[in-house]
């Protein structure tokens, strides 16, 4: 159960990272 929570939190973290990278890429273009 805790493993599933960790995995879901981790994918949320990755999504946030990806979104921030995307925004920075847009700004730098």
Curated annotation (Swiss-Prot):
GO MF annotation terms: hormone activity
Signal sequence coordinates: none
Induction / repression: Produced in the A cells of the islets of Langerhans in response to a drop in blood sugar concentration.
Sequence similarity: Belongs to the glucagon family.
Lineage of source species: Eukaryota, Metazoa, Chordata, Craniata, Vertebrata
Name the UniProt record assigns to this protein: Glucagon
Physiological role: Glucagon plays a key role in glucose metabolism and homeostasis. Regulates blood glucose by increasing gluconeogenesis and decreasing glycolysis.
GO cellular component terms given for this protein: extracellular region
